[in-house]
Amino acid sequence: SQGKVRAQLMGSGTILREVLAAAELLSKDFRIPVDVWSVTSFNELRRDALEVERWNQLHPDEEPRKSYLEQCLAKRPGPYIAATDYMKIVPDQIQRWVPGSFVSLGTDGYGRSDARKALREHFEVDRHYIAVTALKALADDGALDRKTVSQAIKKYNIDPDRPDPVTL
């Protein structure tokens, strides 16, 4: 890895295991340090942030408050990748309070899978896709060479030309 390269991975519920596995892949295969965040509720993080935002708006003469999310993520470098077994819109709802680039992975579209593992692979939200997404976000932020992303795609046997699961 280069300098201060670091990724922030978020997972909610049972997909947290895939997030932890992706963190291990990033560390082992690419020497990328990762912070893993267990998100119990994207909805509650949003509600808290909106409540703090409202308080700040109605108390302009007071010291602005920070939401729980903003407090947790302050000074945490790297892009943020949020993985969920729900649609991408669920983690997307916290994006405006995240202090860096943010990518959601979720199960948008129609599933054709009989098991969770197959479902996550179909929707491109398994450990390999989480790792590749983190590498791509790091490259987009200028923290990593794009060739590293291509290497990961090959290493994890991802077909870059397969149909988008949302369109299937």
Segments the model singles out, each with a brief description of its role:
Residues S1-L168:
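Thiamine diphosphate
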